[in-house]
UniProtKB/Swiss-Prot annotation:
Annotated Peptidase A2 domain residues: 459-530
Domain RNase H type-1 span(s) in chain numbering: 971-1093
InterPro entries according to UniProt: Aspartic_peptidase_AS, DNA/RNA_pol_sf, dUTPase-like, dUTPase-like_sf, dUTPase_trimeric, Gag_p24_C, Integrase-like_N, Integrase_C_dom_sf_retrovir
Record organism: Maedi visna virus (strain 1514 / clone LV1-1KS2)
Residue intervals of every Integrase-type zinc finger in the record: 1228-1269
Binding, Mg(2+) 1: D652, D727, D728
Ligand binding (Mg(2+) 3): D1291, D1343, E1379
Free-text remark on how the cofactor is bound: The RT polymerase active site binds 2 magnesium ions.
Name this polypeptide is given: Gag-Pol polyprotein
Length: 1506
């Protein structure tokens, strides 16, 4: 089981190389080595034991300290082995830290022991030195400054090990990383300022970063000088930086403050540069893109460098360095080629001139030409130089004095790639850009300013549809003052003065309006409050400064667009539509369609509650014909996946669809028509220029467009959390309030360049914020609607119930409760107005969800913490909760139970869904908490019941599933029931024998496992509160002992058993192996294996021992007319013993009334339904009521005698036909044969064989049929050809005006016919595929008709593997069989046509007659013969394959590698790639023999043939 690592501990970066070296040390004499996990375990264990040393970095000093402390510890008896492993692992790490390379763990421990001995000698020597020099202090501090006992200090150089340690961290994590800062802060506490700065300079790192660090140190020095004027006790910058001091002077105690200040400056500089490297706009992150010109790259780079708060020399260095290192490969090569060795010192202007043409087509062609130009002599170099800019020879383009010349328009000042004339030419292609939709009025480059008279003064106000209020900076005091007013915008909350009834005039229009006086406003604005009154409108789509990317859309291949006529509309609706369309045309959203655009889509309108009309478009046909686009956004963002942020802003994009232009070539398919009332004039046709509402691709095009527009802006602001779904935008950040609002303002300005606006009235600043149906708070989130409506007992329509359930499902991520009873209520009638009835159980279920929604609150995701998902069994569902801290869920959910899945499988399915949700919303893999025990889940996985487990999982106790655990594997006081079930003598049987003497057995269909469970079920039904059950089925035994939940059992037998078990006090379940001599088990096995008289159904009653027969019950009220016979099927199936037969007789009470039972012999072994034939001999109708005893079943012993020859002298008075009391039963079948013949008109032989009537009687039926006499077949049919299994003949025939394609199988005579449209090759090939799919033929005979000999037909026959031969058309010898079939088919068809409405039905009936009803001499139909042949082929193939698999061999066995004698021959039971399995006759064991010890021989029967 894997375990997920936590992010709280970032590992041991300082020991990365040490651990890598330690992993090469072998544990023992074998090849096994220490692993990284062993090392990490040892280090973390030590951190846990010695918490006071946990924060210190792992130096060799710390390791010796830990080693000394470990030696002083005494582990418990149970932990000694683990403690020894800890010491051994630490010894290996210490050796690797010191650069030693021991081969084994034992060698590492020896090295450390030897080092300890040397250290003890050194300490002893140190004691002698102390005696000689008592003033010398024994130091234990970090070098280089050493305190002496006499009070002085000495300096010692930085240890090389420490220096190497810092170098390693700087190389692996970076010079400005947190790891290097932490290491430096630890070691440098006792360093001199000079040591700190020298070590910093010698560290590996980016030169630009070092320059920035130096710049930050200079800034700190300047700030120190400003804040600390020179004085007697004030440190100077030179003292702090260690300038002009020796290390010995700097080590004195009075310089401690200077060293601390210097270290603080260095750490501050490291942090500042690190912050610069991670924020957007960092010059070192500004790199040239592949498609970006060098000039654009330099512009971005210089802008980023100028924004840096560093000194000018640093900026100059960054410009010179980064303009080369951050350039693209092509530009670097061009600069190397042009500037040579001075490329690093060259100015930015020189580099721009060198790279001016890099990336252009001319540059690429120039490189290609240079590559293909042959090498010339050195003396001619430069003679034919020509300027690419002006075209004159003698100099290059970079040396041209005429400046940049455009090669497209010829003007100076810009390059060809920036030429505006070139960009304006050409038609839009996919991926091209186009401007936002423009009105037919004036187009402005920015929001316009217009002159408005405010009071008595004329002012130029900015027209802004995003502003609610009209704002001016000053006012002449006219109007009515209304006090102070608070305004909220992107810049925050501001306060101004409100004035009403102010005189406003625009051109000739004058109104009384409201204004706000705000002296601090940078611009005066005309807001929406007065724009409408003055008749001023602004089309927001006209304000773009950049072009909106276009998305290509098109129709499906072969489609021509919708051509649906406009349906009539009322005068009222036409007027409403005209008003809407006129406004759309003025705003540039629709245009007049040209006459050759013929597509049309219907439009209509509805009136809203406000009384305004709303235009609707029926785009269904256009949507069908339009190619789909990929789904841009696969789901709704969830607040549980958001991170907690200090500030949030919710924005709404106004007129989102109507701002984005529709792909121009597609616009012709969006035309619609405005009708003219009473046809008084021509109709006006329009088309859409923008994304219309209701068109299926509008959402996708909008999402792709916004993705392209916002991609760059989002990349430039990685510090914010940005989300967008359709026109709703979420922005969250941990920045300061002003900086956060500045970013929002920047976004508004950015998308305004494309024509999009963010209306002020829909902007939400701060918490609580409503977004996509959620309500966001600083520490939590919930749904906007916190409550669900109440439901009460009583009727409710399905429509209303579906809406209620839909509201609940939407809020499941905070409820997490299942509603199985309410969901079950929705089953049944699907009509929306059909009623359901709400009961108390539904109300309780609903109230539980309402209460949960009120109480639950969601939390935000913290990327620093692990995510957990806990699953548990709910009410017929799996409920799970996703959290990072207990009691603070991110979200919850429910997975309803799935049929035919076990409990474990359903929990794993829910775990998969949970994992998928977490990965989608947070990008992390969760830790799954499964209910139950780990060993149970591992067992489920090993048994194959589940095939997936989470990456990280563990178990918890889970909810209690059994209220009462009453099934145990121990003996309980009470009777014992021995149960058994299975297939006995080909019939399912089950039963039990109790220790009380009670017995029970019954026949029943089912599998062995089902019958075993049914036996236990019957025992549980009859058993007392305490009982024992003994079974020989391991399956049933394990089921009874499993910790099942009744709700998850899908097997109905198991569910019934569990229901019975719940009501028992205690049940002991025991298992015994079958057929092992256990008396009671063998007794029940014999008992249910006996063939016993068994019945199924309620149509028979038990009899007394003295009664002759069993009474049969009439199933329903039966009416028998006078003199009529009626067959009555009763509810009874019976299973007779092999030595029994039965007879159905008349009851004496019925015989007295003239009602008799006729016939009714039941043979031995009969298992079918019983039918009673009743004859009413009376002159009036007789009624037998339901439930009346009307016949009796008499059992008789079966007596069997062999028949002997009578003798030639014997004579019979019965006649040649043998008609007698038993032979006359066929008379009853004559009416049935006549009825069948009237349906299908089969011949006499078929009737004779099917109904068992004499041949003469069958011939009489045919002769008396008028239809058959009128349509007699010719008596003689000649002609024949090849016959064989799977060999067919085919030909066309005509019946009246219809063409029929006829196929006939030559062996069986099976016919297949189909009506076709014509005798074409295409039609024949289609029918051939149908014919082949049904019959799988091998060969086919046809004439030379054009449809049969076409090349495509021949290719099809080869493809299908059919051997196709052709003969001569109309030659009886080549097509005899199919020609005869034509006549038979048409003759039968003519008989059946009057009986059917459709010709195809009559043709199908003809095939039934000829293939199924027509019997041959042996009583078989063509269909019987065909099926028999196919089965024989299958059996032969199977037998052949089995024979091929049987092999025989001689073999020998080996003992200690020496081969023994050859044994055999014997049969090979199994053969593999390198060995076989045989059975040794002597030991009766199975042996695996390698192929080298085997000699294969032919089967024994082949040897006999020889």
């Amino acid at each position: 089981m894997a375990k997920q690592g936590s992010k709280e501990k970032k590992g041991y970066p300082e020991l990365k190389e040490v651990i890598k070296a330690t992993c090469k040390i072998r544990v023992g004499p074998g090849k096994e080595t220490l692993t990284e996990g062993n090392c990490l375990w040892a280090l973390k264990t030590i951190d846990f034991i010695f918490e006071d040393l946990k924060t210190e970095p792992w130096t060799i000093t710390k390791m010796y300290t830990v080693w000394d402390r470990l030696k002083g510890l005494t582990p418990e008896e149970t932990s000694k082995r683990e403690f020894a492993s800890l010491q051994a692992t630490l010894a290996c790490i210490m050796c690797s830290q010191m650069g030693m390379k021991p081969e084994t763990v034992q060698a590492a421990k020896g090295i450390i022991s030897m080092k300890e001995g040397l250290q003890e000698n050194k300490e002893a020597k140190g004691e002698k030195v102390e005696q000689l020099y008592p003033n010398l202090e024994k130091h234990r501090e970090v070098y280089p400054i050493v305190n002496l006992q006499a009070g002085g200090r000495s300096w010692k150089a930085v240890e090389s090990v420490v220096f190497q340690q810092l170098q390693t961290v700087a190389m692996q994590h970076g010079l400005v990383s947190e790891d290097f800062e932490r290491q430096l802060a630890y070691y440098a506490t006792t360093w001199t300022s000079k040591d700190i700065l020298e070590v910093l300079v010698m560290m590996p790192g980016n030169r630009a970063q070092k320059e920035l660090i130096q710049g930050k140190l200079n800034e700190e020095a300047e700030r120190w000088v400003r804040q600390n004027p020179p004085g007697p006790n004030v440190l100077t910058v030179d003292q702090i930086m260690g300038v002009g001091q020796t290390n010995q002077q700097a080590s004195q105690a009075n310089m401690d403050q200077a060293r601390q200040i210097c270290l603080q400056w260095v750490i501050t500089a490291l942090r500042s540069v690190r912050h610069m490297s991670h924020r957007p706009g960092n010059p070192m992150l500004v790199k040239q893109k592949n498609t970006e010109s060098y000039e654009d790259f330099i512009a971005r780079l210089l802008e980023a460098i100028d924004a840096e708060p560093v000194m000018d020399p640093i900026k100059t260095y960054l410009k010179v360095t980064l303009s080369y290192t951050n350039a693209s490969t092509d530009c670097q090569k061009q600069m190397d080629r042009t500037l040579g060795t001075r490329v690093q010192q060259a100015t930015v202007e020189e580099k721009m001139q060198a790279c001016r043409d890099v990336g252009s087509e001319g540059f690429k062609m120039q490189l290609l030409a240079q590559a293909l130009r042959p090498q010339g002599k050195a003396g001619h170099k430069g003679v034919n130089q020509k300027c690419y800019n002006c075209g004159k020879p003698g100099h290059l383009a970079r040396q041209c004095r005429q400046g940049i010349i455009c090669h497209h328009c010829g003007k100076r000042g810009h390059m060809q790639k920036d030429c505006r004339q070139k960009k304006q030419q050409g038609k839009q292609q996919e991926g091209a850009t186009c401007g936002a939709v423009r009105a037919p009025y004036v187009v402005t480059e920015a929001p316009p300013k217009i002159e408005i008279k405010v009071g008595t003064r004329w002012k130029k106000l900015l027209v802004d549809t995003g502003a609610d209020k009209t704002i001016v900076t000053s006012h002449d005091m006219s109007g009515i003052p209304k006090g102070r007013i608070i305004l909220q915008g992107i810049g925050g909350i501001i306060e101004g003065e409100k004035w009403e009834q102010v005189h406003l005039q625009y051109k000739d229009k004058m109104i009384k309006g409201t204004i706000v006086v705000l002296a601090t406003s940078p611009v005066e604005v005309l807001g929406r409050d007065n724009m409408r009154e003055l008749g001023i409108g602004l089309i927001m789509a006209n304000l773009e400064e950049k072009k909106i990317p276009s998305t290509r859309v098109r129709l499906k291949e072969g489609c021509k667009g919708p051509h649906i006529a406009q349906w009539p509309l009322t005068q009222e609706k036409l007027e409403g539509l005209k008003e809407i369309v006129d406004r759309l045309e003025k705003e540039g959203k629709v245009g007049r369609a040209p006459p050759h655009w013929t597509c049309n889509t219907p439009i209509f309108c509805i009136k809203k509650k406000s009384g305004k009309w709303r235009m609707l478009i029926d785009f269904r046909e256009l949507n069908k014909q339009t190619e789909d686009l990929a789904e841009a956004q696969l789901g709704l963002p969830h607040p549980g996946g958001l991170q907690r942020k200090k500030h949030v802003t919710i924005l709404d994009i106004g007129d989102a669809y109507f701002t984005i232009p529709l792909y121009e070539p597609y616009r012709q398919y969006t035309c619609f028509t405005m009708l003219s009332p009473n046809n008084l004039g021509p109709c006006v046709r329009y088309y859409w220029k923008v994304l219309p509402q209701g068109w299926k691709l509008s959402p996708a095009v909008y999402q792709f467009t916004m993705q392209k527009i916002l991609r760059g802006w989002i990349e430039e602001h990685p510090m914010i959390q940005f989300g967008i779904y359709m026109d709703d935008i979420y922005i969250g950040s941990d920045l300061g309030l002003e900086e956060h609002r500045g970013i929002v303002n920047e976004l508004a300005s950015y998308i305004a360049q494309y024509g999009f606006m963010l209306p002020e009235d829909k902007r939400q600043e701060g918490y609580p914020a409503k977004w996509l149906g959620f309500e966001l708070h600083p520490e939590k989130w919930k749904f906007q609607k916190h409550t669900l409506p109440e439901i009460t007992e009583g009727p409710i329509t399905l429509n209303k119930l579906q809406k209620l359930v839909g509201d609940l499902v939407w809020r499941q991520s905070l409820i997490g409760k299942s509603i199985p009873n309410i969901l079950k209520l929705m089953e049944g009638d699907r009509a929306l107005q059909s009623e359901r009835y709400i009961e108390s159980i539904h109300v309780r279920e609903w109230e539980a969800c309402r209460q949960k929604l009120k109480e639950m609150e969601g939390n935000y995701y913290d990327e620093e913490k692990d995510i957990y998902g806990q699953l548990d069994w709910g009410n017929k569902a799996i409920e799970y909760i996703v959290f990072q801290e207990k009691g603070k869920p991110l979200w919850v959910n429910v997975v309803h139970s799935i049929k035919n899945l076990s409990q474990a499988q359903q929990i794993i399915k829910a775990a998969q869904k949970l994992t998928q949700e977490v990965i989608i919303r947070t990008g992390k893999i969760p830790w799954i908490l499964l209910p139950g025990r780990e060993e149970d889940w591992i067992l489920e996985l090993q048994m194959g019941n589940i095939n997936w487990m989470p990456s990280f999982w563990s178990c918890y106790k889970g909810s209690v599933r059994w209220k009462k655990r009453n099934v145990i594997a121990e003996v309980v006081p009470g009777p014992t029931y021995y149960t058994d079930g299975g297939k006995k003598n080909g019939r399912g049987s089950l039963g039990y024998i109790a220790s009380t003497g009670e017995k029970f057995r019954i026949h029943e269909e089912g599998t062995n496992q089902q019958l075993e469970l049914r036996a236990i079920e019957e025992a549980c039904k009859q058993g007392p509160e305490k009982m024992n059950i003994v079974t020989d089925s391991r399956y049933a035994y394990e089921f009874m002992l499993r910790n099942w939940d009744e709700e998850v059992i899908r097997n109905p037998i198991q569910a019934r058993i569990m229901e019975l078990v719940h009501n028992k006090e205690k049940i002991g379940v025991h298992w015994v192996p079958g057929h092992k001599g256990i008396p009671q088990n063998e007794e029940i096995d014999r008992y249910i294996s006996e063939i016993f008289l068994a019945k199924e159904g309620r149509g028979i009653l038990q009899k007394r021992a003295e009664d002759a027969g069993y009474d049969l019950i009439c199933p329903q009220e039966i009416s028998i007319p006078a003199g009529q016979v009626k067959r009555i099927a009763i509810d009874l199936k019976i299973n007779l013993k092999k030595d029994q037969w039965a007879m159905i007789g008349t009851k004496s009470s019925f015989a007295n009334k003239g009602v008799f039972v006729q016939g009714g012999i039941i043979d031995s072994g009969y298992q079918g339904t019983i039918q009673v034939v009743i004859y009413n001999s009376n002159n009036k109708e007789v009624v037998i009521p339901q439930g009346r005893k009307f016949a009796q079943l008499i059992l008789m012993p079966l007596i069997h005698e062999e028949l002997k020859p009578w003798g030639e002298t014997r004579k019979t008075e019965r006649g040649e036909q043998g008609f007698g009391s038993t032979g006359m039963y066929w008379i009853e079948n004559i009416p049935l044969a006549e009825e069948e013949h009237n349906k299908w008109h089969q011949d006499a032989v078929s009737l004779h064989l099917e109904f068992g009537i004499p041949r003469t009687a069958a011939e009489d039926i045919v002769q008396q049929c008028d239809v058959c006499q009128e349509n007699k077949m010719p008596s003689t049919l000649r002609g024949s050809n090849k016959r064989g299994i799977d060999h067919w003949q085919v030909d066309y025939t005509h019946y009246e005006d219809k063409i029929i394609l006829v196929w006939v199988e030559t062996n069986s005579g099976l016919i297949y016919a189909e009506r076709v449209k014509g005798e074409t090759g295409q039609e024949f090939r289609v029918q051939t595929m149908k014919w082949y799919a049904m019959f799988a033929p091998k060969s086919l005979q046809s004439d030379n008709g054009p449809a049969f000999v076409a090349e495509s037909t021949q290719l099809l026959m080869k493809y299908l593997g059919i051997e196709h031969t052709t003969g001569i058309p109309w030659n009886p010898q080549s097509q005899a069989l199919v020609e005869r079939t034509h006549q038979t088919l048409k003759n039968t068809l003519e008989k059946l046509i009057p009986m059917f409405n459709a010709f195809e039905s009559a043709l199908a009936g003809t095939l039934i007659t000829l293939n199924i009803k027509r019997k041959g001499g042996l009583g078989t139909s063509p269909m019987d013969i065909f099926i028999f042949n196919k089965e024989q082929q299958r059996i032969q193939q199977q037998s052949k394959s089995k024979q091929e698999k049987i092999r025989f061999c001689y073999y020998r066995t080996r003992k200690r590698g020496h081969p023994g004698e050859w044994q055999g021959p014997t049969q090979v039971l199994w053969g593999g790639d390198g060995a076989i399995v045989v059975k040794d006759r002597g030991t009766d064991r199975y042996l695996v023999i390698a192929n080298k010890d085997v000699k294969f021989i032919p089967p024994p029967k082949e040897i006999q043939k020889e």
